[in-house]
Amino acid sequence: LSKSINHSLENLQEFEIAKTVQESLLPQSSISNEVYEIEGRTHPMSKLGGDYFDFTLTPENEILLLMGDVAGHGVQAALMMAMAKSVFMLEQDEPEAHLNIMKNLNQTFYKLRKSSIKTMMTGQVVLLSNKSDSIITNAGHTSPIIINKNSIETINLASYPFGFTKNRKFKVTPFKLKENDIMVLYTDGIIESLNNSEEMLGNQDFAEILKASYSKDLNEFHNNIFRFYKKWATSQSDDLTFLLIKRKENA
């Protein structure tokens, strides 16, 4: 009994440490510059989720973003998030930061897959340019959606997760946001959610939710999305994370 109690206490301490680490990884919920306004929120399924996002202002006052989804939950997922955070922090101010982040994450997860740690992470990096086309680079993550009051468009980015090949070349895809356009980055927890009939929401119905939820106010937009999700899903079976990126009026 004493051994069992000690083991339980060790597990609890491990959990609390991982929870503290994970809570310190996510940035504040919003960031902006003279051109863009961004809000990010995560809704973990459990106290230790596997979703991660980060953003920062570059030395040129542009915005660099990372969104990732680590397979699973718990202590291991929290540690993988910490590794992603360290890569982002090390590279964020360097030239070609968007590509270096992707390459370093790929190398990290390639080495992990070759070791005894079997894990997986999808992710994407976005560099928001103030004057020219913005760019996005993807590794198996969900396709971004650009929406405004009158239209909705999906940027299809077919790719595979980090770590499956050693020296991987990442495709850089340009895009442009117009005034009051909002780009929605999200993890797969929303599109894979199930209703009472065990039907998956899917990409098409998620697009309909976005159209019904659209607001130029990012906080309201997010609240609308989550309200529709709660009506659809019987219970939360995965982490949910959203990054809403808006190009400001007259910017």
Regions from the language model: what does each represent?
Residues 6-184, 227, 234-251:
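… and, occasionally, acidic/histidine-rich disordered N-termini of signaling adaptors
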